[in-house]
Structure formats: structure tokens, C-alpha cells
Amino acid sequence: MARFSIVFAAAGVLLLVAMAPVSEASTTTIITTIIEENPYGRGRTESGCYQQMEEAEMLNHCGMYLMKNLGERSQVSPRMREEDHKQLCCMQLKNLDEKCMCPAIMMMLNEPMWIRMRDQVMSMAHNLPIECNLMSQPCQM
């Protein structure tokens, strides 16, 4: 009987030694960092600019100001003067991060309604931040 006890004890020790690596389960945590490249310098990325642009009502007054400059009066609020739209446009642009002004204007011009007028309006649009005294250089579009 003592012999069986020694055999069982030895088997138990071997079993514990064999299971030791299994019971020492290690946990590996992988941390992934995504660095989003921002082509517009510091501040928010283009998607952040789009969010700001949405908050600025898609620069609707800038669009109306540009349309009035083109003589597109039928599509624009007849009650507001061109100068009123310009002032409101400047307020909308001022609410954007400086790095988002030009990308937001470009996003506005990528809207379907601007496709047929894009060439005509491009030169006026890239000067909007200058007209509003918000930047010293025109937007590079």
C-alpha cells in the first residue's frame, strides 16, 4: 500500500510539473496606435473640417454670396443683399479653424450644384478668406 502511495505521489508531482507551464497563462495586450496624417497642418483633419463645415451650415451664405456675384439671382434668397451674404459668409468662415477654411471652401465647391459653375466661381472662392480679412493669402485650390 505504501508503494502505491509513493507511485501516486510521484505521478502527482510529475503531473504538477507538466501542467505548470499551462497554468502560467500569460496575457498579451496589443496596443495599436493609428496616426492620421493631416495634410492641412496642425488642428483637425479633413473629416474634422467637414464636421466644422456642417456646423457652419455647409457655408451656405458663402455659396449665396458667390451665386449673387455670378448673377444667379433666381436661386438665391431675394430678400438678402449680396453684402449681407458676404458678412454672414465671413462669420461662417471665422467659426472654422484657420486650417479648415480652404478645405471647407473646396468641399463646398465639390457639391453637385457647383459643377456647372465651378470654373467661373473658383477664382472668387479662393479669395473668400482674404475678402473676410481672415487670411493674407488666397486658398490654393
From Swiss-Prot:
What one GO molecular function would you report for this record?
Answer: nutrient reservoir activity
Q: Which Gene3D superfamilies does its entry note?
A: Plant lipid-transfer and hydrophobic proteins
The answer to whether UniProt assigns keyword Disulfide bond to this entry is yes
Q: Which residues form the propeptide?
A: 26-38
Mind listing the UniProt keywords for this protein, alphabetically?
Disulfide bond, Seed storage protein, Signal, Storage protein
Q: What's a Pfam family in this record? A: Tryp_alpha_amyl
Q: List the disulfide bonds.
A: 49-100, 62-89, 90-132, 102-139
Q: Which domain of life is it from?
A: Eukaryota
Q: Which residues form the signal peptide?
A: 1-25
Q: What does this protein do?
A: This is a 2S seed storage protein.
Describe its partners and assembly state: Heterodimer; disulfide-linked.
Q: Which family does it belong to?
A: Belongs to the 2S seed storage albumins family.
What's the protein name?
Answer: Albumin-8
Q: What is the lineage of its organism?
A: Eukaryota, Viridiplantae, Streptophyta, Embryophyta, Tracheophyta
